[in-house]
């Protein structure tokens, strides 16, 4: 008989499987859009509905994650995602189907990060667990993108059946995670007002303010570039197959894994301000992307983007969880983080969608994304400088 895996290892595997399918489904949606002759902007719309789910549900899901055992909340999130797969199988509109997957993801997310402080016993362990979880997530993004592209090129229905089975496997690993008791005293009355207070609390603490802006900027760039590069590859390099596109995207995933894995040796929770340098590298790489016209350079640039992104995002996540666990609660902290990040992403993808509809070239949209990132990093530099003299910090 095989030994039972630890709660942390079970979480890593469950997260890998769930994130694998989340990203697999985006490529399946792309195949459905291509096959159904939807408008050119429709993939961005599908991505936007996923993000919008996070924005509208954020005031409630953090409380839900803190009220109930987080391992159980992970199961609930996967079940809702499975419902989204069923809608895809029933040939519902891909935007609606992926929006339901987004609802499952918004329920799942506060629990997956919020449970980490309960499964670790020190700041070092928390940062290490964060790094591992981020690495598993990134590998899942990489593998799910390749798997989704490969399978959807062969059979959309077959790919969706596999997706449903993998969500089921993730639930089985969720069952192996030890359960906390949750806080049954938490209620949902005045959730929006309380959520606004939670945002204000985290914004008043220098580390969490800086981390929220930083993670938001990362995901704005990531989400916008993802849909932009989908359009850029056929136009600039003449690559159209889902399998080929997903393999090129794999370079970013490999870079993210590399960056996330080396981060604990470069940046700690105490030295989180060093992330600004990784952010600057990320912005410069995005701006430079508009001057690329060959496949080898594209792959190298995507790898470098991923590596800079991994070094940038992991310490920011760990710092935010460290502060949130000691203040408003882990689940509510992740809900605030999701709200900020997905608002940033929704705005970025929204601007891109409007610009494509207006006939603005893809390269101009990518350059605009890099410019937005530079503006946000300038604000973060101001936050970092101001913190030396005024804003309170939490040890």
Ranges and model annotations:
Residues 56, 247-268, 344:
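Transmembrane alpha-helices of Major Facilitator/SLC transporters
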Residues 95-98, 102, 128-180, 250, ...:
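Hydrophobic alpha-helical transmembrane segments
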Residues 1-9, 179-213:
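Juxtamembrane intracellular "pre-TM" segments in multi-pass secondary transporters
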Residues 114, 118-119, 160-190, 381-392:
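Helix-loop junctions on the cytosolic side of multi-pass membrane transporters
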Residues 72-87, 164, 273-289, 367-370:
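Structural signature of the two symmetry-related core transmembrane helices
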Residues 9-26, 49-65, 69-80, 97-152, ...:
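Substrate-agnostic recognition of the 12-TM MFS/MFS-like secondary transporter fold
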